[in-house]
C-alpha cells in the first residue's frame, strides 16, 4: 500500500483513476489531478510548500518532487511525464512536456 501521509494538518488529495505504486510516498500538501500515475519509489513531499500536479501526469520510478523553503510551489501541468529518477525541486513544468 502506498505511503500517503497527512502533515501539518494537510492531507494529500488524489484525483480519479490514478495509479499509485505500493511504495510511492505522497506527503502533506500535494494535489494530484485525474488519470495520473505515480510509480515505484517516487516521493512527492509537500512539507514546506504545496505541490500541484495536473491531469494525465506520469511520475516515473524513483522521481522526487520537493519544494524549497522560500515560497516555492512545485507545479506540474497537464500531460507531463517526469522520467525515472527525475528531481523536480522548487520548479514548475508547463503542459504537454
Model-derived segments and spans:
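A structural motif detector for beta-strand N-caps
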Residues: 12, 17-20, 24, 30, ...
